Amino acid sequence: IVMPLADGDAVKTKITGCYKGSCGSTGELCGVFQDTNIGTLSLNTACGVYGFLNNIVSTNEAVPIATKQEVKTGSAKIISTVDEKGPQYYDVRIVRICNNDSSSSKNMIIEITDSSLIEKTGGIIQGMSGSPIIQDGMLIGAVTHVFVNDPIRGYAVFADNMLKVSEALNAERLLEKAS
């Protein structure tokens, strides 16, 4: 079940640490909301939360978006903030590609292979959803779910699916502005 979202504010956060996950118990990130508004939120879907930023993010670190056909099993990296050090790259493995259309957000099974991330978090924890997954220099998707009984593993959504929702939202916004 996805909670409907009428609208909201995107604000900066400060991640201060986490509660480590274990088999049968999902961990979670710890942090605080800051008073800096960075945009608006307008849609919550199985593929993620969507909205608009107040300022364009620097394109110095932009990476191309892979189509679902370009995603393959094997090594990749996620970018996640799990402590006060900010965004860091961590090693993961794409275990399986789920090419059926029955789920818009459970397109890949991923496994955390980075020993430092496993030591800090126990694997995937609440708050890591949305962490980008990079493979061969391309954005292939984002973390969506943890397997509660195996927190080293979880699901991820194809970036391709996320992009389709984003494009539809942008088209809707343009129509609203035109009328």
Residue ranges and their predicted role:
Residues I1-S179:
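C-terminal recognition in membrane/secretory proteostasis and scaffolding
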